[in-house]
Amino acid sequence: MAGSEPTGLAPDDDRHLGAVLALAERSRREGHHPFAAAVVGADGRLLAEAMNDSRRDRTAHAEMNALRAAAEQHGEAALAGATLSSSAEPCAMCAGGAYWAGIGRVVYALSETSLLALTGSDPENPTLALPCREVFSRGQRPVAVIGPLREDEARRAHLGFWKEPSQPDLSQT
């Protein structure tokens, strides 16, 4: 595998991403949207993990839940330079949350473009065509982004979950 790893991939990134993908499958089995995320400290220690829970609160995305849990359990300082590992590319809201939480790196599996191909215009998952790299590029400090990784594996949690709507037209964005 040496030489084939994306630039910036830390030794434990793949292991943490695998755990997040398994948690996304569990999220689906428990009746939530099939997303999960984890916050990993700069020392490689798992600080928090979370599933999507947006049935009553559409902002309760896995990334936001993991960021909040990590801050509550370990203090805000623990998030400085930490890695957000996510089953899918963080949306604009979650990218903003990661930025303001002090996250230094984002590692994700399924790209926003691939997710959109799976969800189409399903009202359960309205998509903003705004990659997290673009959100982070507008900030005053850098956030490294690594992904997509393991997309085929990440896609499995979504297959058959979303309705079969027509694809939205994002050409005007």
Predicted regions and their residues:
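Small-residue (primarily alanine) positions within well-ordered alpha-helices
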Residues: V20, A24-S27, A37, A48, ...
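Signature of N-terminal electron-transfer/Fe-S-associated modules in redox systems
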Residues: M51, A60-E63, H74, A80
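A short, polar/charged loop-to-alpha-helix boundary motif
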Residues: R55-A69
